[in-house]
């Protein structure tokens, strides 16, 4: 840990508190600095006793790199960040004990599994000043609570829209049927993801993407679509470059990647939610029960939910924060990040094991066709 020449008043108070608690921490076998305390032990804000280390797993890499320096500067905590490409990477760590992770940004369905398996600390959101910054849209749908207790704080809203080339189309495509049109043969793309692609097909055929009734129809239309496609994409950067290079003109791509393609690489692209609907979900900050520095993690979660900090998520990654940042954005970015009230948006609830299995079977059959 780097040496510092001065202590802020907050850190001085924290150091004083630690010295008075050292004997107790030693008796408990802890490492000091609040490692024996859990988030619900915090009785006032801000917490004055916490370790000076923090280990963060967050797949918004550019934001996490910025947050590391900013949080270290503001709170005197040494932050280690790690990215991940698939949620099962951190989930499997929690299954095996989860040692070494203090704060995770996880998707809703994996957070729900973690709650059910008692992997997460309860978070005292009523004590956190920044909790009031979280928008009602995501508070009302995100599955981060159980038995009246809160286990996650929403970080972002993730939309799975239809991205399209604005030079090719005179107006935003109004339907997912654009991905089944022979007119665009060889110019459209689909995500190599069983859940996303099957849910798009479910929406296209007028079904509930969470609880579909006609799996045969979903499989049939996906097989019909296959010869029309330029390719399936499996890597986010690959998909982004397909649009940047104008190899494709329409297909599913995340809002964040669409933003990057448009404003950082100059691609003529935008996104929309077709009339049949589009899926969206949330990523949430969670604190594992095995976290070595849970109080520092709680402090980080509140800090990250401040508008100025959350705005950096949009600025660096193009994703919509769970916090209202409208007063932090330029007119251009505000227009890009605003979702129309007319859109039919479907929250991505956790799929049942049966639906998930059926979607996997369908996708295997489609890819083999």
Label each residue range with its predicted role.
Residues 1-20:
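N-terminal secretory signal peptides and thylakoid transit peptides that target proteins
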Residues 38-113:
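Early extracytoplasmic/lumenal segment of secretory-pathway proteins
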Residues 100, 104-230, 237-244:
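Extracytoplasmic ligand-binding site segments that recognize negatively charged/polar headgroups
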Residues 111-113, 251-268:
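A ligand-binding cleft/hinge motif common to bilobed small-molecule-binding domains
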Residues 219-225, 265-289:
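Periplasmic-binding protein-like
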Residues 278-279, 283, 288-346:
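Mature extracytoplasmic/periplasmic domains
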Residues 331-369:
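Extracellular/periplasmic bilobal clamshell ligand-binding domains
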